[in-house]
């Protein structure tokens, strides 16, 4: 027999909310769950292309790499683009 009063309360009909709408009910230790994304509005399942950026990571990446310049060598000259050596094939 389990010890009394050590387990959290179980809510068999906990409501899951997304954008203020109840989307499903599940069993949980919390009476309500709030989610930003679920299968009904996820870009993979809906077929739409949408950037999900909850914390500004995309903007930070774009700011960081938007003004990039070609890397320079130690002497201050621009690095030459790498090219593969050409081979002459006869026959």
From Swiss-Prot:
Chain segments carrying region Disordered: 62-91
InterPro entries with a match to the protein in the record: Ribosomal_bL28/bL31-like_sf (IPR034704), Ribosomal_bL31 (IPR002150), Ribosomal_bL31_A (IPR027491), Ribosomal_bL31_sf (IPR042105)
GO MF annotations, alphabetized: rRNA binding; structural constituent of ribosome
Gene Ontology terms: biological process: translation
Keywords assigned by UniProt, alphabetized: Ribonucleoprotein, Ribosomal protein, RNA-binding, rRNA-binding
Single GO cellular component term: ribosome
Subunit text: Part of the 50S ribosomal subunit.
Family the entry assigns: Belongs to the bacterial ribosomal protein bL31 family. Type A subfamily.
Protein's job: Binds the 23S rRNA.
HAMAP family: Ribosomal_bL31_1
Protein name (Swiss-Prot/TrEMBL): Large ribosomal subunit protein bL31
Protein source organism: Thermosynechococcus vestitus (strain NIES-2133 / IAM M-273 / BP-1)
């Amino acid at each position: 027999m389990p010890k009394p009063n050590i387990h959290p309360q179980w809510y068999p009909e906990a409501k899951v909310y997304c954008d203020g709408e109840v989307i499903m009910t599940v069993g949980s230790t919390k009476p309500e769950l709030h989610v930003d994304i679920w299968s009904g509005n996820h870009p993979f399942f809906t077929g739409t292309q949408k950037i999900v950026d909850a914390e500004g990571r995309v903007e930070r990446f774009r700011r960081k790499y938007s003004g990039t310049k070609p890397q320079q060598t130690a002497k201050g000259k621009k690095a030459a683009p790498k090219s593969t050596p050409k081979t002459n094939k006869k026959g």
